[in-house]
């Protein structure tokens, strides 16, 4: 037997080349059946719940149903290329997403991949999309205001940083408009050089909306200069149901990065009704037993585990916060349906938007009687508390009287006065889109309304009065606005100054 030196050296070289490299054993399974975005796979015995798997053609999926003889996998993409008998590979990673400030100004899909054509995401940190919510000890009660810039909301239904406030109403009642105005209102807080404790980053999650609608939303954010402090997560109507199910969790993880690093963020889920429908579709196709309205039994848990992740953290953890504004679409104002009642019971209050009010021209179409904030005035500045307490009572009396006044024609003077004031205050709470007001501006406008300065005006002049008063204050009396902003209070001294300015303005206004 002759020994060939070349052969030996080739074997040695081969062994040296592969030294220290253990054979990579990837656990693989076989597709048993596929259809409707669901694949049944045999052979992935050790797969984890929620683990990402990869099909032959590179399409990703998530293992949801772990059964004794097969695994039910939802597919994040088209199932057309996936055939029976193909192999499926474990990735050994639970579904995660990139997080960090590199995402600001970007539009991503439900897996965190960019879809805005601006190149790869600048982020080296990844987090799991479905994590446990903070417990009781890490939390702190909500006490800082999260201003929306809308008088009707900031005065009557105040939202605090770390709160969950539901926006609920029929289609076309201005739910997204409220959310958009809230994002635009954070622009003055997010100026370059502002302290992180003041800034409020925004995450907008679009679920099951038309692509054109999302594109329009992003365009408005860009034009108004609000995209630079915002992240948009989009799972549109043409995306598969698993993507629509996952998008809110992905957005929440991105928002949690700010919360956990001592910063503040607000996340808008627009809307959770469509996420529930996508989850119902997946559950029924996975053959899980249906419950009320054919939703699966754990649809409450779907929303509660998502919304419980919004919290105000205590000082030892950096005092960060994540505020949630989930949106729910009702059918014919029916708030007693399954998903609306679930989300109402999870959140810390709700803003009801009504079709009737919208068509009467009261926009934002907030039904002040049915809307509530369970955090309440602890999330308001002192100045706003002083002026808003009065307006709440007067509007409540007005609503009660207006119902009776329809029947009687001869009303006594005090009732007439009450109805007059109520009509003017309702007019005062109207606000056009894209024109959010700062806290101090809202305070002076509401102060003028509750102190009777509008009572003698015709209804159609209220808007002009408000604009005129604000431009006068912004121009010649900016010191009053600055004093209210800095002290967050309306001191007697400032109230006296404001009174003399408004008295003077009323005389010239005609």
Curated annotation (Swiss-Prot):
It is a peripheral membrane protein. One of its GO terms (molecular function) is ATP binding. It catalyses: ATP + H2O + 4 H(+)(in) = ADP + phosphate + 5 H(+)(out). ATP binds at residues 169-176. The keyword ATP-binding applies. Signal peptide: none annotated. Disulfide bonds: none annotated. Its main location: membrane. It holds the Pfam family ATP-synt_ab. The keyword Metal-binding does not apply. It is found in: Cell inner membrane. It is an enzyme of class 7 (translocase). Its EC number is 7.1.2.2. CDD domains: ATP-synt_F1_alpha_C, ATP-synt_F1_alpha_N, F1-ATPase_alpha_CD. Keywords: ATP synthesis, ATP-binding, Cell inner membrane, Cell membrane, CF(1), Hydrogen ion transport, Ion transport, Membrane, Nucleotide-binding, Translocase, Transport. The record marks 371 as: Required for activity. GO terms for cellular component: plasma membrane; proton-transporting ATP synthase complex. It comes from the Bacteria. F-type ATPases have 2 components, CF(1) - the catalytic core - and CF(0) - the membrane proton channel. CF(1) has five subunits: alpha(3), beta(3), gamma(1), delta(1), epsilon(1). CF(0) has three main subunits: a(1), b(2) and c(9-12). The alpha and beta chains form an alternating ring which encloses part of the gamma chain. CF(1) is attached to CF(0) by a central stalk formed by the gamma and epsilon chains, while a peripheral stalk is formed by the delta and b chains. Belongs to the ATPase alpha/beta chains family. Produces ATP from ADP in the presence of a proton gradient across the membrane. The alpha chain is a regulatory subunit. This is ATP synthase subunit alpha. It comes from Afipia carboxidovorans (strain ATCC 49405 / DSM 1227 / KCTC 32145 / OM5). The gene is atpA.
């Amino acid at each position: 037997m002759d020994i060939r030196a070349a052969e030996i050296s080739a074997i040695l070289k081969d062994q040296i080349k592969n030294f220290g490299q253990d054979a990579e054993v990837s656990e693989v399974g076989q597709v048993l059946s596929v259809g409707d975005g669901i694949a049944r796979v045999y052979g992935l015995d050790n797969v984890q719940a929620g683990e990402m798997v990869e099909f032959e053609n590179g399409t990703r999926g998530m293992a949801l149903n772990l059964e004794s003889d097969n695994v039910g996998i939802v597919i994040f993409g088209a199932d057309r290329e996936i055939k029976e008998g193909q192999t499926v590979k474990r990735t050994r990673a639970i579904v995660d997403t990139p997080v960090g400030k590199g995402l600001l100004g970007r539009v991503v899909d439900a897996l965190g991949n960019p879809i805005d054509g601006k190149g790869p995401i600048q982020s080296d940190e990844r987090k799991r999309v479905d994590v446990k919510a903070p417990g009781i000890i890490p939390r702190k009660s909500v006490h800082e205001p999260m201003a929306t810039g809308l008088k009707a909301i900031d005065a009557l239904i105040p939202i605090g940083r770390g709160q969950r406030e539901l926006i609920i109403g029929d289609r076309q009642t201005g739910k997204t408009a409220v959310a958009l105005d809230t994002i635009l209102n954070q622009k003055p807080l997010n100026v370059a050089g502002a302290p992180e404790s003041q800034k409020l980053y925004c995450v907008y999650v679009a679920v099951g909306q038309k692509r054109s609608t999302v594109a329009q939303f992003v365009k408005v954010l860009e034009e108004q200069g609000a995209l630079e402090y915002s992240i948009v997560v989009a799972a549109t109507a043409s995306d598969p149901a698993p993507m629509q199910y996952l998008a809110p969790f992905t957005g929440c993880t991105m928002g949690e990065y700010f919360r956990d690093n001592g910063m503040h963020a607000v996340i808008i889920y627009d809307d959770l009704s469509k996420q529930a429908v996508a989850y119902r579709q997946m559950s029924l196709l996975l053959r899980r037993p249906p419950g009320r309205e054919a939703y699966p039994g754990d649809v409450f848990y779907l929303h509660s585990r998502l919304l419980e992740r919004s919290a105000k953290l205590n000082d030892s953890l950096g005092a960060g916060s994540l505020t949630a504004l989930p949106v729910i679409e009702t059918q014919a104002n029916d708030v007693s349906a399954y998903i609306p009642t679930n989300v109402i019971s999870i959140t810390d209050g709700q803003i009801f938007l009504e079709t009737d009010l919208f068509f009467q021209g009261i926009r934002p179409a907030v039904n002040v009687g049915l809307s509530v904030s369970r955090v309440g005035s602890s999330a308001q500045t002192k100045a706003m508390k002083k002026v808003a307490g009065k307006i709440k009572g007067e509007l409540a009396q007005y609503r009660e009287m207006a119902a009776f006044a329809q029947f009687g024609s001869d009303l006594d003077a005090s009732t007439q006065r009450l109805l007059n004031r109520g009509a003017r205050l309702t007019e005062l709470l109207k606000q056009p889109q894209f024109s959010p007001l700062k806290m101090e501006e809202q305070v002076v406008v509401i102060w003028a309304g509750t102190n009777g300065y509008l009572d003698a005006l015709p209804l159609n002049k209220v808007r002009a009065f408000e604009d005129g008063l604000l431009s006068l204050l912004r121009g010649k009396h900016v010191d009053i606005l600055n004093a209210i902003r800095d002290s967050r209070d309306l001191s007697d001294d400032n109230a006296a100054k404001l009174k003399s300015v408004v008295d003077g303005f009323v005389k010239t206004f005609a």
